[in-house]
Amino acid sequence: MNLNATLFAQMVVFLILAWFTMKFVWPPLINALDERSKKIADGLSAAEKGKAELEAAHKRVDQELAQARNDGQQRIADAEKRAVAVADEIKAQAQAEAARIIAQAKADAEQQVVKARETLRGEVAALAVKGAEQILKREVDQAAHADLLNQLKAEL
């Protein structure tokens, strides 16, 4: 093998090129790669953080929806309870009013019965007096007396 000066010159040039590359070219490349790596890592962590925030937001939305559903169901139940209470109150008032009307009607009917009895007593008394007058005006005869009683029965 023949070592000549060209080979040494090429080695020197290669070493200078390697030194120049390591001194001036390699650090910016390493810095660029490090920055890119850092940006990728930051992007991945931001993506994971965003994903976690999205999941948390979904959980909050689900909780708020569940709360809203529960509130709605509670309001419906309360409204139904109030409706039942109002219906019961109206029913009780209607029953009380019906009882009052029935009691008033019974009292009115009783008054009318009493009034009719008083009127009937007056008429019976008048008829008895009239019958007694007629009996006393005539002479006491069994046949006439029986006829007058039959007449009075017919009038009653």
From Swiss-Prot:
One GO cellular component term noted in the UniProt record for this chain: proton-transporting ATP synthase complex
Transport found in the keyword field: yes
Membrane topology: Single-pass membrane protein
Keywords assigned by UniProt, alphabetized: ATP synthesis, Cell inner membrane, Cell membrane, CF(0), Hydrogen ion transport, Ion transport, Membrane, Transmembrane, Transmembrane helix, Transport
Coiled-coil intervals: none
GO molecular function: proton-transporting ATP synthase activity, rotational mechanism; proton-transporting ATPase activity, rotational mechanism
InterPro entries assigned to the protein according to its UniProt record, in alphabetical order: ATP_synth_B-like_membr_sf (IPR028987), ATP_synth_b/b'su_bac/chlpt (IPR002146), ATP_synth_F0_bsu_bac (IPR005864), ATP_synthase_B_chain (IPR050059)
UniProt cross-references to CDD domains, sorted A to Z: ATP-synt_Fo_b
Compartments it resides in: Cell inner membrane
Sequence intervals crossing the membrane: 7-27
Subunit details: F-type ATPases have 2 components, F(1) - the catalytic core - and F(0) - the membrane proton channel. F(1) has five subunits: alpha(3), beta(3), gamma(1), delta(1), epsilon(1). F(0) has three main subunits: a(1), b(2) and c(10-14). The alpha and beta chains form an alternating ring which encloses part of the gamma chain. F(1) is attached to F(0) by a central stalk formed by the gamma and epsilon chains, while a peripheral stalk is formed by the delta and b chains.
Similarity-based family: Belongs to the ATPase B chain family.
HAMAP family, A to Z: ATP_synth_b_bprime
Function recorded in the entry: F(1)F(0) ATP synthase produces ATP from ADP in the presence of a proton or sodium gradient. F-type ATPases consist of two structural domains, F(1) containing the extramembraneous catalytic core and F(0) containing the membrane proton channel, linked together by a central stalk and a peripheral stalk. During catalysis, ATP synthesis in the catalytic domain of F(1) is coupled via a rotary mechanism of the central stalk subunits to proton translocation.
Protein's name according to its UniProt entry: ATP synthase subunit b
Organism: Paraburkholderia phytofirmans (strain DSM 17436 / LMG 22146 / PsJN) (Burkholderia phytofirmans)
